[in-house]
């Protein structure tokens, strides 16, 4: 597989944005399979970035020889949401990134049945949020997903300040009740 590191100016985020892409080797994929290539979005966990899956897993080795495009975007600690502090990661992922990638990779599928999403921890939260709120993904997988905030207390988790959590999700009383 080819490992591509892409940085482009995101109109939604109003900044340069980093995305890693694993792309099938042309010599390992039949010509007929080079059209409408399935795509998997892999979302990193908290404190990770678009390099996490490549550095901490065998994803590249395991997918070698397959006909699958793997997209690994960076959202810092933005929880794959449109944050209160101005970074609209949800909108960037749900709307902008697939269109940008389609321009880079015209043979990448646009079909829901061939588009998948998975994530680790914070990325598990993001993948279910994106899969349930859009009609883009046919399958979603959450690995140790941060899916329940009912008993969550930022103070007890040592995971950022209350101001950080308000910046991502708004007032704590509102998002723990949702």
Language-model-detected regions and their locations in the chain:
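Non-catalytic cap/lid and distal C-terminal segments of serine-dependent acyl enzymes
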Residues: 1-178
């Amino acid at each position: 597989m080819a490992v591509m590191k892409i940085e482009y100016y995101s109109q939604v985020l109003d900044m340069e944005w980093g995305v890693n892409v694993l792309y099938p080797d042309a010599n390992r994929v039949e010509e007929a399979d080079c059209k409408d290539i399935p795509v998997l979005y892999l979302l990193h966990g908290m404190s990770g970035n678009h390099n996490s899956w490549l550095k901490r897993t065998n994803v590249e080795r395991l997918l070698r020889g397959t006909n699958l495009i793997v997209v690994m975007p960076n959202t810092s600690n933005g929880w794959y949401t449109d944050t209160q502090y101005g970074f609209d990661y949800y909108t960037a992922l749900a709307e902008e990134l697939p269109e940008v990638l389609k321009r880079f990779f015209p043979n990448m599928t646009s079909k829901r049945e061939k588009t998948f999403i998975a994530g680790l921890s914070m990325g598990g939260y993001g993948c279910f949020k994106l899969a349930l709120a859009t009609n883009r993904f046919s399958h979603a997988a959450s690995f140790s997903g941060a899916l329940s905030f009912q008993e969550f207390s930022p103070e007890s988790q040592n995971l950022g300040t209350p101001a950080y959590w308000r910046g991502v999700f708004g007032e704590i009383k509102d998002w723990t009740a949702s």
